[in-house]
């Protein structure tokens, strides 16, 4: 697949651009509702784009079929804040504005109902953008309520974590 960049807008629209030329490739026919897009991430295989929305849902788009929405995942009680893919592109982990972490089976298009402990300990994630979870324990300052950290990115070799917080650190 050609490399693409996905851009989500406040009105729920998504546009796809070629990279690095930034030529517009397409706008998927179906909007992700009318709510703001809060995050987007391609699967490691590059075949699926996961979009997180302020309608509390995750949209799975088929990158090889003009970004047609394949599945819509429901379950969060607030807007979807972060999305991470497993290395094998089989699972998603997501978090939301209510600080819920959920796991999803991409093939089934459903919330993963297996043993949560085994997913957390046995799954290798392509990267880590959730502001919650074992790999990022200790990123919040003492006495923090957890809302100070706005963004996290763990390197693929799992050796570094970059954190952006309200204090500019």
At which residue positions do the language-model features occur?
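WD40-repeat beta-propeller superdomains and closely related acidic/aromatic-rich repeat-like regions
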Residues: 1-169
């Amino acid at each position: 697949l050609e490399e693409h960049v996905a851009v989500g807008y406040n009105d729920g629209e998504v546009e796809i651009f070629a990279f690095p030329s930034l030529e517009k490739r397409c706008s998927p026919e179906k909007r992700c509702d009318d709510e703001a897009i809060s995050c987007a991430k391609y699967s490691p295989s590059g075949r699926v784009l996961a979009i997180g929305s302020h309608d509390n849902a995750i949209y799975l788009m088929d990158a090889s079929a003009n970004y047609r929405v394949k599945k819509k995942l429901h379950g969060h009680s607030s807007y979807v804040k972060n999305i991470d893919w497993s290395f094998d592109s089989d699972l998603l982990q997501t978090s939301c504005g209510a600080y819920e972490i959920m796991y999803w089976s991409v093939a089934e298009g459903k919330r993963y109902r297996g043993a949560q402990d085994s997913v957390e300990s046995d799954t290798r994630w392509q990267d880590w953008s959730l502001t919650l979870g074992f790999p990022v324990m200790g990123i919040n300052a003492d006495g923090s309520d957890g809302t100070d950290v706005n963004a996290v990115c763990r390197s693929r070799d799992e050796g570094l974590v970059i954190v952006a917080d309200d204090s500019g650190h």
